């Protein structure tokens, strides 16, 4: 959520910056709500002051032996008026808060202009896409014949966009998770956390999925729970309604969870294979840092996600998303896109974002500034390190041979019991 003071003091400038991402801020509605709030707040304060003055007068009149009943009746009437004003103020503040909850984050000045992915800017590349001297198979063709990837049974068990993995494919999937967790905890300084896969609405409001994106979520309405769309939600909310001490920040968390998304609006997209599933898994990186550290933290976090791809010998590129292509809560996002030979293109495998204090303000996540001793809002960041299913796809397609065998990257072999080749003929 944006700082209300920013909107009060810099309304037109903020509206112009939000327009970069294609969002039209309703300045008239905000100005009206804010004016009404201020008017009622002033009226409420005046009533409180007047009631306090009259209450004090009762004591003075009583000490003089005067009749205090008229004063008591007046104080009672003022109390009723004050209660009514406080109710109106509370309702108006709730309306204003709901309005603020629907406003996305302001893009950082370094974010490229543009309204869609065509305006994203390539920052760097790593690795060269492999040149094959045989017809390239995509991951479906590599995984189906042996039954490693069983889309038919997944559809029978649940429906479209679900998959069963068997044998060495399930083992490889598990190996990727363990490899990522070990890398981030041992080399990058993250604390591993295990979190609930079901969360309440407050958690989703804190990170920005609610109220605007409820259609993308799986909702267990009778219990008030939602299946998590990403570990970002429960992990970032570890700091909700909390004041961390200076020694606890910066904090780095890593968590492996399943993720559940309805894929509303994705009908007809990536219907083949593992690229877009209702249920998939990610290893998520979250950082909670003081404001002055967040931009360095974004570069570091992005590098941590990149390191996974480098160790798996997978070519990729890093893209700075333009203002119109960023997520609702983000101030700046880098997408890491891995090369997929089966599609002959780069596909997103991680989004690394700095939210500044946007999420922290929504969830009241703070730390105590050691210099002032006062609580200040944290800056929050997150990124996939990595999406496990898409990493699996990339390993299959980039490390295949002419016989349809998969050569296991050296970094994964200890997690595969020393296995060097997955051979569908064996």
From Swiss-Prot:
Residues 44-64 are annotated as: Disordered. InterPro entries: aa-tRNA-synt_IIb (IPR002314), aa-tRNA-synth_II (IPR006195), aa-tRNA-synth_II/BPL/LPL (IPR045864), Ser-tRNA-ligase_type_1 (IPR002317), Ser-tRNA-synth_1_N (IPR015866), SerRS_1_N_sf (IPR042103), SerRS_core (IPR033729), tRNA-bd_arm (IPR010978). GO terms for molecular function: ATP binding; serine-tRNA ligase activity. SUPFAM superfamilies: Class II aaRS and biotin synthetases (SSF55681), tRNA-binding arm (SSF46589). The keyword Protein biosynthesis applies. L-serine binds at residues 230-232, 284, 384. It catalyses: tRNA(Ser) + L-serine + ATP = L-seryl-tRNA(Ser) + AMP + diphosphate + H(+); tRNA(Sec) + L-serine + ATP = L-seryl-tRNA(Sec) + AMP + diphosphate + H(+). The keyword Nucleotide-binding applies. Pathway: Aminoacyl-tRNA biosynthesis; selenocysteinyl-tRNA(Sec) biosynthesis; L-seryl-tRNA(Sec) from L-serine and tRNA(Sec): step 1/1. ATP binds at residues 261-263, 348-351. GO terms for cellular component: cytoplasm. It is found in: Cytoplasm. Keywords: Aminoacyl-tRNA synthetase, ATP-binding, Cytoplasm, Ligase, Nucleotide-binding, Protein biosynthesis. One of its GO terms (biological process) is selenocysteine biosynthetic process. Pfam families: Seryl_tRNA_N, tRNA-synt_2b. Homodimer. The tRNA molecule binds across the dimer. Consists of two distinct domains, a catalytic core and a N-terminal extension that is involved in tRNA binding. Catalyzes the attachment of serine to tRNA(Ser). Is also able to aminoacylate tRNA(Sec) with serine, to form the misacylated tRNA L-seryl-tRNA(Sec), which will be further converted into selenocysteinyl-tRNA(Sec). Belongs to the class-II aminoacyl-tRNA synthetase family. Type-1 seryl-tRNA synthetase subfamily. This is Serine--tRNA ligase. The lineage of its organism: Bacteria, Pseudomonadati, Pseudomonadota, Gammaproteobacteria, Chromatiales.
């Amino acid at each position: 959520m944006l700082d209300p003071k920013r909107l009060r003091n810099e309304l037109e400038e903020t509206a112009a910056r939000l327009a970069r991402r294609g969002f039209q801020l309703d300045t008239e509605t905000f100005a009206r709500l804010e004016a009404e709030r201020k008017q009622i707040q002033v009226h409420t304060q005046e009533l409180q002051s007047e009631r306090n003055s009259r209450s004090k007068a009762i004591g003075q009149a009583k000490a003089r032996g005067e009749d205090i009943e008229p004063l008591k009746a007046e104080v009672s009437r003022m109390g009723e008026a004050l209660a009514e004003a406080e109710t109106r103020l509370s309702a108006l503040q709730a309306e204003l808060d709901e309005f603020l909850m629907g406003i996305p984050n302001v893009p950082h000045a370094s974010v490229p202009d543009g309204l869609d992915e065509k305006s994203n800017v390539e920052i760097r590349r790593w690795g060269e896409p492999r040149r094959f001297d045989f017809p390239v198979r995509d991951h479906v063709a590599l995984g189906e014949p042996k039954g490693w990837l069983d889309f038919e049974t997944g559809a029978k068990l649940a429906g479209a966009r679900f998959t069963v993995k068997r044998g060495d494919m399930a083992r490889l999937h598990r190996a990727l998770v363990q490899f990522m967790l070990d890398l981030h905890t041992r080399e990058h300084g993250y604390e591993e956390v295990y979190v609930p896969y079901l969360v309440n609405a407050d958690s989703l409001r804190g990170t920005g999925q609610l109220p605007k994106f409820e259609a993308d979520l799986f909702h267990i309405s009778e219990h008030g729970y939602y299946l998590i769309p990403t570990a970002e939600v429960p992990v970032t909310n570890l700091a909700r309604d909390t004041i961390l001490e200076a020694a606890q920040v910066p904090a780095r968390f890593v968590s492996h969870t399943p993720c559940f998304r309805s894929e509303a609006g994705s009908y007809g997209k990536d219907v083949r294979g593992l690229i877009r599933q209702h249920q998939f898994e990610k290893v998520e990186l979250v950082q909670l840092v003081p404001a002055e550290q967040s931009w360095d933290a974004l570069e570091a976090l992005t590098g941590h996600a990149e390191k996974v791809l480098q160790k798996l010998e997978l070519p990729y590129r890093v893209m700075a998303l333009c203002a119109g292509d960023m997520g609702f809560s983000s101030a700046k996002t880098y997408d890491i896109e891995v090369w997929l030979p089966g599609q002959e293109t780069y596909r997103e495998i991680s989004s690394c974002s700095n939210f500044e204090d946007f999420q922290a303000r929504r969830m009241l996540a703070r730390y105590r500034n050691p210099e002032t001793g006062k609580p200040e809002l944290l800056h929050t960041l997150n990124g996939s390190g990595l999406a496990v299913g898409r990493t699996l796809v990339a390993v299959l397609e980039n490390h295949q041979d002419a016989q349809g065998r998969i050569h296991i990257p050296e970094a994964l072999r200890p997690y595969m019991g020393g296995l060097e080749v997955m051979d569908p003929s064996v």
